From Swiss-Prot:
Membrane topology: Single-pass membrane protein
InterPro entries attached to this UniProt entry: Thioredoxin-like_sf, Thylak_slr1796
The protein's name: Thylakoid membrane protein slr1796
Ranges annotated as spanning the membrane: 16-36
Protein location: Cellular thylakoid membrane
Record's keyword terms, sorted: Membrane, Thylakoid, Transmembrane, Transmembrane helix
NCBIfam families in UniProt: thylak_slr1796 (NF038096)
Top-level taxon of the source organism: Bacteria
Record has Hydrolase as a keyword: no
Chief localization: membrane
Gene Ontology cellular-component annotations: plasma membrane-derived thylakoid membrane
Length: 201
């Protein structure tokens, strides 16, 4: 008699425990697959101050999806006789994350007259020799690295680190024969008197 009363109740309890245990395991399984930042902080956070991968740095930190992939590759830029700005980067480098906005500013001011080519160093083949029209030719091993080539392909600038915009801007102003920043915040080309090469106001 007692067994006949207890058995259905035990069966129901057992079923409830199995369902509860399965649900708890499911929740723990989902929680364990969440990104580290989400399980730690409760929200997904893209951070400038760490070396964690958050996505393409130009999209996430510069709000600029037009830089990658570049409009022209290095060979095409040489064929069109365009000056080139090569920027070597890694998506999981905090220095590159901080530099992404500066690269976007370069495009804003010089994107119509120069070929801006961001190069993920992960995409450079592991080989010893490169041709001049391959990005690996100019890469020196660190990120971020900025290399500027004139329209003949001659290297006129090569520096590593997250540079200030003004550093690159000075090189490009000289390359494009623009007024110094002290004389013009806007990018205006120098004007010359037809009788001499003095700067005209």
């Amino acid at each position: 008699m007692i067994m006949s009363v207890c058995l259905p109740w035990l069966a129901r309890c057992r079923r409830f425990l199995i369902v509860s245990l399965a649900f708890a395991m499911l929740l723990l399984g989902i929680w364990g697959t969440l990104p580290f930042s989400l399980s730690d902080h409760g929200t997904a956070i893209a951070a400038l101050e760490d070396d964690r991968y958050d996505g393409n740095i130009f999209v996430v930190y510069a709000g600029n999806g037009s830089l990658v992939p570049p409009r022209l590759n290095l060979r095409e830029s040489f064929e069109r006789k365009l000056p080139v700005i090569l920027v070597y980067y890694l998506d999981d480098s905090k220095d590159c994350k901080q530099y992404a906005f500066i690269v976007s500013r370069m495009q804003e001011f010089y994107g119509r007259v120069a070929s801006i080519i961001p190069v993920s160093v992960d995409s450079i083949p592991d080989q010893k020799r490169f041709r001049r029209d391959e990005p690996g030719y100019y890469y020196s091993g660190g990120v971020p690295q900025t290399v500027i080539l004139d329209k003949s392909g001659k290297k006129i600038f090569d520096a590593q680190g997250a540079l200030k915009f003004e550093v690159v801007d000075d090189v490009l102003r000289d390359l494009f024969d623009l007024l110094p920043r002290s004389e013009s915040m806007e990018l205006k080309q120098r004007t010359y008197n037809e009788f001499n090469s003095e700067l005209v106001d």
